[in-house]
């Protein structure tokens, strides 16, 4: 999906679920990390996280669009648009939009180091120079034995 398709989808979702036009811009923002989308109060534009489309599919992504459009339409109508406001919660229920996003699985590379003397194994996220450090248990020399990718649910 590109920017033009996102704009078209946002306009269609707005008309279908809110019976109101979306007259501003919807753009992808890949720098968003822990949120599915963001409504900008000053410009009235909506930024969407493309990682949620890749990881969870179009149906889930449309739910995030509906959530952001709730903020958008309530703010323009000068009603309570924040998560804690009653107007916002009622509109979320009416259009069946999610209140929160699921976390995106994150890929972490773990580096494995092993002591030559005692054979103890260490896992670290950051690589380090094995010539500068020794085993904490026996003082032996370390060697890097490999690295592996781990997927976590924490973002």
UniProtKB/Swiss-Prot annotation:
Residues that bind Zn(2+): 67, 71
What's an example of a GO molecular-function annotation for this chain?
Answer: zinc ion binding
- GO biological process assignments: response to stress
- Which keywords, in A-to-Z order, does the entry hold? Cytoplasm, Metal-binding, Zinc
* Key word Zinc present: yes
Q: Which residues form the SprT-like domain?
A: 7-145
The cellular component terms of Gene Ontology attached to this UniProt record, alphabetical and capped at eight, are:
cytoplasm
Q: Which SMART domains match?
A: SprT
Q: Where is the active site?
A: 68
Cofactor dependence: Zn(2+)
Q: Where in the cell is it found?
A: Cytoplasm
- Family the UniProt entry places it in: Belongs to the SprT family.
* NCBIfam families registered for this protein in UniProt: PRK04351.1 (NF003339)
Q: What is the protein's given name?
A: Protein SprT-like
Q: Which organism is it from?
A: Listeria monocytogenes serotype 4b (strain CLIP80459)
**What is this organism's lineage?**
Bacteria, Bacillati, Bacillota, Bacilli, Bacillales
